[in-house]
UniProtKB/Swiss-Prot annotation:
Gene this protein is translated from: rpmD
SUPFAM superfamilies: Ribosomal protein L30p/L7e (SSF55129)
NCBIfam families the UniProt entry points to: rpmD_bact
Protein family membership: Belongs to the universal ribosomal protein uL30 family.
Protein name (record): Large ribosomal subunit protein uL30
CDD domains: Ribosomal_L30
Annotated source species: Beutenbergia cavernae (strain ATCC BAA-8 / DSM 12333 / CCUG 43141 / JCM 11478 / NBRC 16432 / NCIMB 13614 / HKI 0122)
UniProt-listed GO biological process terms: translation
InterPro entries assigned to the protein according to its UniProt record, in alphabetical order: Ribo_uL30_ferredoxin-like_sf (IPR036919), Ribosomal_uL30_bac-type (IPR005996), Ribosomal_uL30_ferredoxin-like (IPR016082)
HAMAP family documented for this protein: Ribosomal_uL30_B (MF_01371_B)
Quaternary context: Part of the 50S ribosomal subunit.
GO cellular component: cytosolic large ribosomal subunit
């Protein structure tokens, strides 16, 4: 299964509570922090909620 590298690029100050919780669920919390997530519909949905706060790249599995 493909993997996605999710990097937080913007702050959550002034953001909604559900956006902060979604970032925490993705393992983010500071600008510049990155995590690698499996490419599943659930993760894609979480990324959609915080799309304006993160950048996403596909990661090679090899």
């Amino acid at each position: 299964m493909a993997q996605l590298k999710v990097t937080q690029t913007r702050s959550t100050i002034g953001g909604k509570q559900n956006q902060r919780e979604t970032l925490a669920t993705l393992g983010l919390g500071r600008i510049g922090k990155s995590t690698v997530q499996e490419d599943t519909p659930g993760v894609r949905g979480m990324i959609r909620v915080v799309a304006h706060l993160v950048s996403v790249e596909e990661v090679d599995e090899s």
